């Protein structure tokens, strides 16, 4: 160290433990258009003021550490630090606060969801001053959005590839999800696709197990796709899960799918990781493959009301990283999803511009600056009686996925698929005629049963099935 540097450091440096409020709590700060904004739900430890807790979150997720260090004098902390610029109590909750934090854009690597999450949530959730912490929402500025490719193709390009317009898409997860041989698996795929579905799907934990190696599955499924296309005259697809133990193996599976000429593959983006997902998304765009994304493991992260990361943040991250489909919850069925919150997820996935709306959990206005949209996928315990509600809630730009609601049909897979297709088209036609599906949906389904024995049989089987549990994440 030169004498000049040593003297300067000694003059400006005073050792000691930091009071975060002095540096990182800045209530007069006006966020810039280029700042990344975060809304954290904090539960401070007893005796910790919310201002200190909010400042600590800003510090530990940006430039701060627990003590003063002499190297602070070698850069401009004022330029790079996160700032807690507002704190508000959570109505009806004791000792919970929403802390709003602004991060300068220079803190983040361009086009990297991995770096974004490592910075904002990578370390601060273990901070002792907090009993619990939840990332409620992020505002991604247009300047940062533009550094991402986003979904490989998006909703409109997908419809053009499939030549399917004016209705939602239908899918089905093959069951049992584990244990079938590759040939029997392909047979189940064929029956569903020839019956009227647009897609079938690998379950999220179908990779390359001893009972069915991935290459065998890919070959038999491709045969099923081509055979069903020849019979129906429609383009068909199956979400071939490319998730693997290594990124290299994942890309090998994606390349095999491309060589087979199938239209779509699949990835488990949370268990597989954002870096792998972004690489796969780039490959899919370059090679004309659609990319279906499963959110396996999401409830570990997003289900608790006061700790973790909300799914709206995970959905934004996926739209940046890249995926043409993403499971979003259903509102109806067996898996959790409160209506307004779920619709907030759906809008963030599909729309170009979403206004702030706290009633739906949206803390910031989000401008995606024409980044391609991601199609929401509704799945989990749904059947033909849910179809009117699903069409009314999700509209046309969604994939409605009936697993047991297809394969559980008393006459087999193909009749189960036909029942779902008839129900979807009947509900879509009724909506287009101006009928209120919320009130008349049951009548629409019953009328369609008169000319579809497959639908009538399905309605009889599932007429009493309900999943009535209170949702956890309500606003």
From Swiss-Prot:
Other notes: The basic functional RuBisCO is composed of a large chain homodimer in a 'head-to-tail' conformation. In form I RuBisCO this homodimer is arranged in a barrel-like tetramer with the small subunits forming a tetrameric 'cap' on each end of the 'barrel'.
GO cellular component: chloroplast
Post-translational modification N-acetylproline, affected residues: 3
Described purpose of this protein according to its UniProt entry: RuBisCO catalyzes two reactions: the carboxylation of D-ribulose 1,5-bisphosphate, the primary event in carbon dioxide fixation, as well as the oxidative fragmentation of the pentose substrate in the photorespiration process. Both reactions occur simultaneously and in competition at the same active site.
Homology family: Belongs to the RuBisCO large chain family. Type I subfamily.
Required cofactor(s): Mg(2+)
Assembly, per entry: Heterohexadecamer of 8 large chains and 8 small chains.
Reaction equations catalysed: 2 (2R)-3-phosphoglycerate + 2 H(+) = D-ribulose 1,5-bisphosphate + CO2 + H2O; D-ribulose 1,5-bisphosphate + O2 = 2-phosphoglycolate + (2R)-3-phosphoglycerate + 2 H(+)
Protein name listed in UniProt: Ribulose bisphosphate carboxylase large chain
Modified sites of kind N6,N6,N6-trimethyllysine: 14
Propeptide: 1-2
GO biological process, one term: reductive pentose-phosphate cycle
Organism annotation: Chlorella vulgaris
Enzyme Commission number: 4.1.1.39
One Pfam family recorded for the sequence: RuBisCO_large_N
Stored HAMAP family: RuBisCO_L_type1
Binding-site positions, substrate: 123, 173, 177, 295, 327, 379
Active site (catalytic residues): 175, 294
Locations listed in the record: Plastid, Chloroplast
Taxonomy, superkingdom: Eukaryota
Record-marked site positions (Transition state stabilizer): 334
Cofactor note: Binds 1 Mg(2+) ion per subunit.
Single GO MF descriptor: monooxygenase activity
């Amino acid at each position: 160290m030169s004498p000049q540097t040593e003297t300067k450091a000694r003059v400006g440096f005073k050792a000691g433990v930091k009071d975060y409020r002095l540096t990182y709590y800045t209530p007069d700060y006006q966020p810039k258009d280029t700042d990344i904004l975060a809304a954290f739900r904090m539960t401070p430890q007893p005796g910790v003021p919310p201002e200190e807790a909010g400042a600590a979150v800003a510090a530990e997720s940006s430039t701060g550490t627990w003590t003063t260090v002499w190297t602070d004098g070698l850069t401009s902390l004022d330029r790079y630090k996160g700032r807690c610029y507002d704190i508000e109590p959570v109505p009806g909750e004791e000792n919970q606060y929403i802390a709003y934090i602004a991060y300068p854009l220079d803190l983040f690597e361009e086009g990297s969801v991995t770096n974004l999450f490592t910075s904002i949530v990578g370390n601060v959730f273990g901070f002792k001053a907090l009993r619990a912490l939840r990332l409620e929402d992020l505002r991604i500025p247009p300047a940062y959005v533009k550094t991402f490719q986003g979904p490989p193709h998006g909703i409109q390009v997908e419809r053009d590839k499939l030549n399917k317009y004016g209705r939602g898409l239908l899918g089905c997860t093959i069951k049992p999800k584990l244990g079938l041989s590759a040939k029997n698996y392909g047979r189940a795929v064929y029956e569903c696709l020839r019956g009227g579905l647009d897609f079938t799907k690998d379950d999220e934990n179908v990779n390359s197990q001893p009972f069915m190696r991935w290459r065998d599955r890919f070959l038999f499924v491709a045969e099923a796709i081509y055979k069903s296309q020849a019979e129906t005259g429609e383009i068909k697809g199956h979400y071939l899960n490319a998730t693997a133990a290594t990124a290299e193996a994942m890309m090998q599976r994606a390349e095999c799918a491309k060589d087979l000429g199938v239209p779509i593959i699949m990835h488990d983006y949370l268990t597989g990781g954002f870096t792998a997902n972004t690489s796969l998304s780039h490959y899919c765009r370059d090679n004309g493959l659609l990319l279906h994304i499963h959110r396996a493991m999401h409830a570990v992260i997003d289900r608790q009301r006061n700790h973790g990361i909300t799914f709206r943040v995970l959905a934004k991250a996926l739209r940046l990283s890249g995926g043409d489909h993403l499971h979003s919850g259903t509102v109806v069925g067996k898996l959790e999803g409160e209506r307004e919150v779920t619709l907030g997820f759906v809008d963030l996935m599909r729309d170009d511009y979403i206004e702030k709306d706290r009633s739906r959990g949206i803390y910031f206005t989000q401008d995606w600056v024409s980044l391609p949209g991601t199609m929401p996928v509704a799945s989990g315990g749904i059947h033909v009686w849910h179809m009117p509600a699903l069409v009314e809630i999700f509209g046309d730009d969604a994939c409605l996925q009936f697993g047991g609601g297809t394969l559980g049909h008393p006459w087999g897979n193909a009749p189960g698929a036909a029942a779902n297709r008839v129900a979807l088209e009947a509900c879509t036609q009724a909506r287009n005629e101006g009928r209120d599906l919320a009130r008349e949906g049951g009548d629409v389904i019953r009328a369609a049963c008169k000319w579809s024995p497959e639908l009538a049989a399905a309605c009889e089987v599932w007429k009493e099935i309900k999943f009535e549990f209170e949702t956890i994440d309500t606003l």
